[in-house]
Amino acid sequence: MLGGGQLGRMFTVAARTLGYRVMVLEPDQHSPAAQLADEHIIAPYDDAAALTLFGTACDVVTTEFENIPAATLDFLAQFCPVRPSAHAVKMAQDRLVEKEFVRSCGLSPVPFAAIRQPQDIAAAQGSVAYPAILKTARFGYDGKGQVTVKSAAEAEAAFAELGEVDCVLEQRVDLQREISVILARSTNGEACCFPVAENEHRNGILHQTIVPARIETQLAEAAQAAATRMAEQLAFVGVMAVEFFVTKQGELLVNEMAPRTHNSGHYTLDACLTSQFEQQVRMVCGLPFGDTRLLSPVVMVNLLGDVWHDAQPDWLALLQSANTKLHLYGKREARVGRKMGHYCTLAPELDAALEEAGHIFQKLQ
């Protein structure tokens, strides 16, 4: 496993449950995944000696976040299979490249314009209406590297604030829902989707995921078909996520993709027969798909460092709920906006799960 965050941690649990040994390469000696892995190489992702040791020791390599250098994945591919490939990961590292890829799949991205120099902002006014969001093309996640702008003048100021690096200017769309599809694709090209998730964000960070998504079946099937098409075009192997916007006119727009397991798929740990992490193990190791059926309506709520205040939260209010599962990631320091854990609340009816999950979150506040 390249990367030692919480996604790698939950992958490690799934892999060891299936009898595999896991080696993590991650610079942070206290990372969540390294705490549970069989072996941990503490090194940067571009350390050739460490990568050689890692590649020769492993039967297959996978990743838990998309900002691993593509050159690192290409280097490791000389020793063992790398799943997903450098090509697939590289596609998700640049928002401009990703949006052109979405178009090449015959799908619709959010209206956008490439901003590489200040004069591009004026030129974009014919294709992007304000308000809009200016995002760095690379290295942005969880609301980082993006600024909401209401005019060309604000966009110019934001572009300067972001260092005049390559950016994407995205039109703000009138949303009905935000949804995501977690998809697994095997070495023989077969694909399998998890139930579509509905996502609610706060300050650019996922707050809660609601499953099943409160959308029409036809729209859910269209989202799964779109995600499958993208995976096929990438010759993807592993687990990936595609986020969509559903407009108030019922249009489906691709927001972004992640070539890995995803925060909005954490509900699968408790509400599906097979979790997204076990499915990742199965895909990279050449095993059959696990069953992705939803066993119960579920609401997943993220726990950010915000709820820690000056001490560990009192988990009693949460653990008193017999149908709620707590997952903590083993991070040493709680910070505002940092994902420290999550919980899943299950109920026979979705409304009941929503009510109880919300009640628990209020108590933790």
PLM region spans:
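ATP-binding N-terminal substructure of ATP-dependent carboxylate-amine bond-forming enzymes
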Residues: 1-97, 104, 119, 358
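Active-site nucleotide/adenylate-binding loops and adjacent lid/helix of ATP-dependent enzymes
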Residues: 91-180, 184-203, 207-233, 357, ...
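A short linear hydrophobic-aromatic micro-motif
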Residues: 111, 131-134, 166-170, 240-241, ...
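Short, low-complexity Ser/Thr-rich regulatory SLiMs
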Residues: 183-187, 244-248, 330
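Protein kinase-like catalytic core scaffold
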Residues: 192, 240, 252-256
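Active-site "cap" helix and flanking loop/linker of ATP-utilizing ligase/carboxylase catalytic domains
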Residues: 221-242, 248, 258-307
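Peripheral (often C-terminal) accessory segments that flank ATP-dependent C-N-forming ligase machineries
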Residues: 282-365
